[in-house]
Amino acid sequence: MSTHAETRAITAADIRAAKNTRRLAMLTAYDYPTASIADEGGMDMLLVGDSLAMVVLGHEDTLSVTLDEMIHHCRAVTRGASRALVVGDLPFMTYEQGPDQAMHSAARLFREGGVRAVKLEGGKEVAPQVEALVKAGIPVMGHIGLTPQRVAALGGFKVQGRSAAAARSLAEDARILEDAGCFALVLEAIPAPVAAHITRTSGIPTIGIGAGAQCDGQVLVVHDMLGLFDRFTPKFVKRYAELRGHAVKAVQQYGDEVRQGEFPAAQHSFGMPEDEQRRWEENVSGADD
C-alpha cells in the first residue's frame, strides 16, 4: 500500500527535481476510472500512451492511433487524476515533420486534452522539436531505446543497444535530449548496464521499462501489470494481479444467474407503496375486464 501522502498536483519541475532524491512510479492510464485508481494509489505520473491503440482499441501496433483519439483519452484521464502529472504521447506522424508540426500537435494535447506534459519518441533527430516545445513552455519527456512507433524500421519489438556502438548511440541521444530540454527520459528495452550508465551520467530522471533496476523510476502498461491484456506479456512485466480471469468469471456468473432467473433478486428491484400498488392492481384488473 502506498504511503505517499502528497496531495499537491505534481509538476514536470517536481519530477526533474526528484533526480537523486527519490524513485518515481509511473503507469499508463487511458480512462477516468483507471486514472482515478492510479492517482489514489500514489503514482507520480500517468502516461496516456499510444499503447492504447493495442490494449484498448485492439490494434496490432501503436501506429494506428490518431491525435484525436489521444485527445479523447487524455480528457478522461485528466478528469480522473488530481495529483499525478498526466503526460500525453504524441502519436505516430504528428511531430516527425519538424517543430511546427510538433507544436501544433502538442498544443492540442494541452488545450483540448488537458495534459501537463507530452512525450515523444526518438533521439537526436527530434531534438529540434524538443527545443521548440520547451521554449514555448511545454514540458517534454523523451523516449529512447525500443521506440514502438519505429518498430517497422527496428525489425520488430527487439531489445536495443546490445552492441557497444548501439549503446554509445543511445548514451549520445540521452545527452542530446537532456540538452534540448527534456525533463525526464523513458528508457525502453535496453540492457541494464547501458541504462545504469545513462542514469548515472544524466541530470534528468530516467524512467525504465525493461531497462533494469538502476533507473530513477519505472513505468508499466497498466493492463499488463493488472493482468487485463492477454495477447502477450513482455519479459519485463511483473503481473501484480490477474484481473482478466476474475472479470471473466464474474461475467459468466452474471450470465448464468440471468438465464436461471436468479438475477435480479428482490434487493435489486424497486417496489411501490402498498396503497399505490393496490390501486394500480385494481386499475389493471378493471382494464382487463
UniProtKB/Swiss-Prot annotation:
User: Tell me, what is an example of a GO biological process annotation in this record?
Assistant: pantothenate biosynthetic process
Please list the residues that bind Mg(2+).
50, 89, 121
Cell compartment(s), UniProt:
Cytoplasm
**UniProt GO MF annotations:** 3-methyl-2-oxobutanoate hydroxymethyltransferase activity; magnesium ion binding
- From the UniProt record, give the pathway where this protein acts: Cofactor biosynthesis; (R)-pantothenate biosynthesis; (R)-pantoate from 3-methyl-2-oxobutanoate: step 1/2
InterPro entries in UniProt: Pantoate_hydroxy_MeTrfase, Pyrv/PenolPyrv_kinase-like_dom, Pyrv_kinase-like_dom_sf
Cofactor stoichiometry and binding? Binds 1 Mg(2+) ion per subunit.
Binding-site list for 3-methyl-2-oxobutanoate: 50-51, 89, 119
Q: Where is this region: Disordered?
A: 266-289
| Primary subcellular site in the record, as a coarse category | cytoplasm
Give the enzyme's EC designation.
2.1.2.11
The cofactor required is:
Mg(2+)
Catalyzed chemical reaction(s): 3-methyl-2-oxobutanoate + (6R)-5,10-methylene-5,6,7,8-tetrahydrofolate + H2O = 2-dehydropantoate + (6S)-5,6,7,8-tetrahydrofolate
Instruction: Write out the GO cellular component annotations.
Output: cytoplasm
Q: What is the role of the protein in this entry?
A: Catalyzes the reversible reaction in which hydroxymethyl group from 5,10-methylenetetrahydrofolate is transferred onto alpha-ketoisovalerate to form ketopantoate.
UniProt subunit comment: Homodecamer; pentamer of dimers.
Return the similarity comment.
Answer: Belongs to the PanB family.
Protein name, entry field: 3-methyl-2-oxobutanoate hydroxymethyltransferase
Organism expressing this protein natively = Oleidesulfovibrio alaskensis (strain ATCC BAA-1058 / DSM 17464 / G20) (Desulfovibrio alaskensis)
